[in-house]
Every structure is written in C-alpha cells, then in structure tokens.
Amino acid sequence: MLVLASASPRRREILSRFIREFQIIPSSASEECSIADPREHALELARRKAREVYERLGKKATVIGADTVVSIGGKILGKPGNEEEAFRMLKTLSGRMHLVTTGYCIIHRGEEHCGAVVTEVKFRELDEDLIWAYIRTGEPMDKAGAYGIQGKGGLFVEWIRGDYYNVVGFPIEIIWKLKELGFDVLSR
C-alpha cells in the first residue's frame, strides 16, 4: 500500500498522474520548526510527516511525506497568516529571484529515502494593485510564499530554472524514486 501523508490537492493530483492506486492520510505531525536553513527545514518536516503516518499505520505501508518552502536571501517564507502578510511576501518577491525547496521522505520497508529539490524562480516586477487583486482571489492564502505557479500566480513568474512540479509542491524526483523502489509509475 502506498500512502501520501498530505492533504494537498496539488500533491495528490501530481502523484495520480503516475500512480493509479494510493491512499491519502494527512499527517498530524507538528509543522513548527526552528531550523533556519530552507533545505534542512523542508527535509525535517517531510521526515516528521512520513514518520508520523508510517507509525500510525503500524509500519505496514510505503509512506511519502513532503514539505515545500519558499526562501529569498536565506529567509523562509511560509504560508501567509493574513492578507497583509501575503502582500508583504509578494512585494518581497517582486522583481527578484527566489528558491522553492521541497524536502521529501519516502519510508519503504522500514528504510527512509529522503532528498530535497531546489528550483529557482524569478518574479516580474509587480505593482501594488496587481498584488492586492491577486490576494482578493484567495489563491495565495494556503501556499508557501503566497503564490501558486499552477494558478493565477503563474502570471508573476518571469522564468524558472529547475523542476516546475517542485514549485507546485511535488517534484518529479519523488516519482523517479518510487520507480527505483519498484512502483509502476507508467501504467494506467
């Protein structure tokens, strides 16, 4: 049995493109983390999520945990707590390059297979009216860095260097790792 330890509809949608059958069991692990390094922060939270669900299921499943963070100048931008915070985040990203890092942990037959994927994203210059119009859509409120590249937030992106799916929150490297672990990732 394969389990995705996430309630994210974006992660579910990407995984379903490659794996026909899996279960979704969101992790209840704490997402409080004082690790400042974006890569280590994302890896720690991914491990926590995977381990919590793996233990809850009695160590009888393959479990995928993932966590995505946006960072700029080494500072992590999480999910905005309110519209003003979303505005500040988007204003900070405006006209600048930032990093999107997804840490993942797959627990398969008792062994942890963990990694992190980093994608560079460059935003266009954004004026305040455009930022507020985007915030009013509600789209940025549940996303790290206050934007979703797969939605209206994609308008802000000038270029990316790396894995697009990583920016969405579920890098293709996870699918490749599942293939290496023996999962059929191409049958439908």
From Swiss-Prot:
PANTHER family: BIFUNCTIONAL DTTP/UTP PYROPHOSPHATASE/METHYLTRANSFERASE PROTEIN-RELATED (PTHR43213), BIFUNCTIONAL DTTP_UTP PYROPHOSPHATASE_METHYLTRANSFERASE PROTEIN-RELATED (PTHR43213:SF5). One of its GO terms (cellular component) is cytoplasm. GO terms for molecular function: dTTP diphosphatase activity; nucleoside triphosphate diphosphatase activity; UTP diphosphatase activity. CDD domains: Maf. Gene3D superfamilies: 3.90.950.10. InterPro entries: ITPase-like_fam (IPR029001), Maf-like (IPR003697). Its main location: cytoplasm. The active site is at D67 (proton acceptor). GO terms for biological process: nucleotide metabolic process. This is dTTP/UTP pyrophosphatase. It comes from the Archaea. Nucleoside triphosphate pyrophosphatase that hydrolyzes dTTP and UTP. May have a dual role in cell division arrest and in preventing the incorporation of modified nucleotides into cellular nucleic acids. Its EC number is 3.6.1.9. Keywords: Cytoplasm, Hydrolase, Nucleotide metabolism. Its cofactor is a divalent metal cation. It is found in: Cytoplasm. It catalyses: dTTP + H2O = dTMP + diphosphate + H(+); UTP + H2O = UMP + diphosphate + H(+). The record marks R10, T68, Q150 as: Important for substrate specificity. Belongs to the Maf family. YhdE subfamily.
